[in-house]
From Swiss-Prot:
Pfam annotation, one family: RRF
Gene name linked to the record: frr
Protein name: Ribosome-recycling factor
Keywords: Cytoplasm, Protein biosynthesis
Gene Ontology terms, MF aspect: ribosomal large subunit binding
GO cellular component terms given for this protein: cytosol
Gene3D superfamilies: 3.30.1360.40, Ribosome-recycling factor
Keyword Transferase: no
Cytoplasm among keywords: yes
Length: 186
């Protein structure tokens, strides 16, 4: 095969799309507590905006509770406000330098909304994978047109790119199915 085409670059980009999907799904609230639920929250601290995990330690002491241990006493109020204003519907209770957050039960309607959002994230991931495939196919066509690779090499590499795309999309579908199961579990 030709050195002019690097399928590993496409693999890295597709893995990036899968990781982005995992990150997006991590922010969706399921019936269980998860430290990743608070990852998107940012805090105004020390004259800049920073992620919550840079000013506090997040743990899961119980299946329906999060514990946020703030490292600097002066930041407790800012962390509490940020969690309250995050739009996640969470209400932290302050206990010294620790915030305790009990996660309320999700009702059926909210579960269905979260599943829809998960499917939207999955579609965005599939679109990203298809864009990577399109870039790879365009690159192959150009290499073939410029006589850098033969038609046979182009066909074989095209099949590899398609298989990589199919495998990536199948992996994304599995990830979303697991997340959907977590969301719908009562």
């Amino acid at each position: 095969m030709s050195d002019a085409f690097d399928i590993n670059d496409l693999k890295r980009r597709m893995e990036g799309a899968v990781n982005a999907l995992k990150h997006d799904l991590g922010g969706l609230r399921t019936g269980r507590a998860s430290a990743s639920l608070l990852e998107p929250i940012t805090i105004e601290a020390y004259g800049s905006t920073m992620p919550i995990n840079q000013v506090a330690n997040i743990s899961v002491p119980e299946s329906r509770m999060l514990s946020v241990s703030v490292w600097d006493k002066s930041m407790v109020g800012a962390v509490e406000r940020a969690i309250r204003d995050s739009g996640l519907g969470l209400n932290p209770i302050t206990d010294g330098m620790t915030l305790r957050i009990r996660l309320p039960e999700l009702n059926e309607q909210r579960r269905k909304e979260l599943v829809k959002i998960a499917h939207q994230y999955a579609e965005q991931g599939r679109i990203a994978a298809r864009h990577v495939r399109r870039d790879g196919m365009d690159q192959l066509k150009k290499l073939e047109k410029d006589s850098v690779i033969s038609q046979d090499e182009s066909r074989v590499l095209s099949e590899k790119v398609q298989k990589l795309t199919d495998d990536t999309i199948a992996e994304m579908d599995k990830i979303v199915a697991v997340k959907e199961g977590e969301i719908m579990q009562v």
